[in-house]
Amino acid sequence: MDQAINHKIHYISRQQRQEILAIARGEAVADYLIENVVILDLINGGEIAGPIAIKGRYIAGIGSEYNDAPTLQRIDAHGAIAVPGFIDAHLHIESSMMTPVTFETATLPRGLTTVICDPHEIVNVMGEAGFAWFARCAEQARQNQYLQVSSCVPALEGCDVNGASFTLEQMLAWRDHPQVTGLAEMMDYPGVISGQNALLDKLDAFRHLTLDGHCPGLGGKELNAYIAAGIENCHESYLLEEGRRKLQLGMSLMIREGSAARNLNALAPLINEFNSPQCMLCTDDRNPWEIAHEGHIDALIRRLIEQHNVPLHVAYRVASWSTARHFGLNHLGLLAPGKQADIVLLSDARKVTVQQVLVKGEPIDAQTLQAEESARLAQSAPPYGNTIARQPVSASDFALQFTPGKRYRVIDVIHNELITHSRSSVYSENGFDRDDVCFIAVLERYGQRLDPACGLLGGFGLNEGALAATVSHDSHNIVVIGRSAEEMALAVNQVIQDGGGLCVVRNGQVQSHLPLPIAGLMSTDTAQSLAEQIDALKAAARECGPLPDEPFIQMAFLSLPVIPALKLTSQGLFDGEKFAFTTLEVTE
């Protein structure tokens, strides 16, 4: 196997270094001098008083010794507290339904200066072309958009139909790209544990970079084996003791708070002064409505401080420095001489009230980002084109026959969690013995002409109507849930007509729908417009019953076989604990 080039080492040219040194010595003029500022010390705790001198994209010096230093431009921080730019340790930008350009516009003014992104959603739909587009966006972004090379396309071989493959040869072509930091989440953890050569080949090929994990609920010898293969982190932990054990075994813990998977309350009590360098924050999947109304990583920091009494320097440490160290991004994560000048000025550090953001040494203006968004998106050459190769359906496509007295498996939803339970329900002439059981179906959309895979869903809260979407992890086939076959067909046909998207049907009519023209995953609308459309969708969905907080994101994970316990793919009902297909009828 070829040896990887470690692009995590950040190089400063000799000329840049000399210019920085001259300013640090007090012999040259800085580009910017941030005055009337207090720096939060993430290493020792406490604060550092004094200005921040900036040359180009780097910090030349900090502290009172730079009072009145010569500079081309002074920035009066008005007593603000300066912290390093926030870093999201693991996310799929596609889950925001925004393009990378729009995502930057929405999150950079909130202090999110760096993201570690796995674009496996779009790669599952269109293969290497999707990864190439994300790389183009990363190259032109002001935000530091780093990429982990998608490792499991599809998530689990032989379990679902997806739109494309992403071979090891294709992956290796991107390994040495300057925006690539490693190998994305290795979801086939049973294959890694059993030593499948195809998976070990991928781990070996990226061994000099960061190897992301994915092992919800794993423990014992299996967890030891998974870590022994070289896996370095996990963002799927949902239990306190699970997270503690992973830390004990040398794993880094990504504490996730997304729109559907909400694990911060369970895992935040683990964070302390000792282990905080091994703890990071991530969102994984967060929708535009929450970003607009609650925030992104800034919202997670706020909750650590206000709800879990995490000390300020520790909360901001896990939001920046810990992640930068883990991914070898040693030029990021601290406000210190020689580091990149990614700086967030806070008028209130406890409430994470962002006053101003600088990235790569330049102040960010939200209005400028918005004004340039359309042109920058066009420059990135998005991969437009209809990816829905599916003919319209009819109610008869969702017909299921049930025998009175028989017991049938039900996917039981846990609100605000990605895991499900595998339950069962007995059918009688009056229906099922549980009032909350509705229907679910997954339809492949890549031209294979498979019949819909149908099943039963409980606990979702759908009392009437139907919801359909082409966002369904990770293969992104069409998923639909409903109380009647007629309304399910209506919802599916609307997203087919839209070329992909989300839809709510109630009372036999489409109540709200959102087209997603890029891969059936992303909109080209502005962040504000998208948030408003999501608001309308959620309002329409709430009329269908007491659904999860984020019904479409929760629904999107009902077809992901690598998260237990029971899921439905385009090929049938899948037992995520036995890693095998099972039957709708309970026969044993």
Swiss-Prot record:
NCBIfam families: ade, PRK10027.1
Keywords for the protein's UniProt record, in alphabetical order: Hydrolase, Manganese
Originating organism: Escherichia fergusonii (strain ATCC 35469 / DSM 13698 / CCUG 18766 / IAM 14443 / JCM 21226 / LMG 7866 / NBRC 102419 / NCTC 12128 / CDC 0568-73)
PANTHER family (UniProt xref): ADENINE DEAMINASE, N-ACETYLGLUCOSAMINE-6-PHOSPHATE DEACETYLASE
Annotated family: Belongs to the metallo-dependent hydrolases superfamily. Adenine deaminase family.
Catalytic activity: adenine + H2O + H(+) = hypoxanthine + NH4(+)
Cofactor(s) for this UniProt protein: Mn(2+)
Record-listed E.C. numbers: 3.5.4.2
GO molecular function, one term: adenine deaminase activity
Protein name listed in UniProt: Adenine deaminase
UniProt xrefs under CDD domains: AdeC
Gene: ade
TM region positions: none
Listed SUPFAM superfamilies: Composite domain of metallo-dependent hydrolases, Metallo-dependent hydrolases
Biological processes per GO annotation: adenine catabolic process
